[in-house]
Amino acid sequence: MRLAEKYGIVLNAADLAAPKTLHALTGAWFAREHFGVPDNIFSAIEWHTTGRAEMAALEKIVYLADFIEPTRDFPGVQDIRTLAFADLNAAMIRALQMSMDEVKRRGASPHPRSAEALRWLQTQN
């Protein structure tokens, strides 16, 4: 929360309800401040936990890289790893669906940006 305040990030109720996603928002600003990252890298960092509508290819790649990284071990992850090399959008759709299903299974609401990303991606395939 301190970094969000430092960088002037306005957190909405969905952000506050999903604290594990906040590092994406603060990390993007940290990377810009300390490393001068350009807009496309800033955006890829910023949206790597929730996704967003109209994601660029780099944003999708970073989202999926985080979702399927080698230490992840959950049912279906290997299928998404394989799919990511064949169809980036299809892999994103499956990853977002799995993520949102898991959040719902735990009794929480998926982040609205994830739902927006999923709806947008479904119109792209």
Predicted regions and their residues:
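Charged phosphate-binding loop/patch that engages nucleotide di/tri-phosphates or the phosphate backbone
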Residues: 101-125
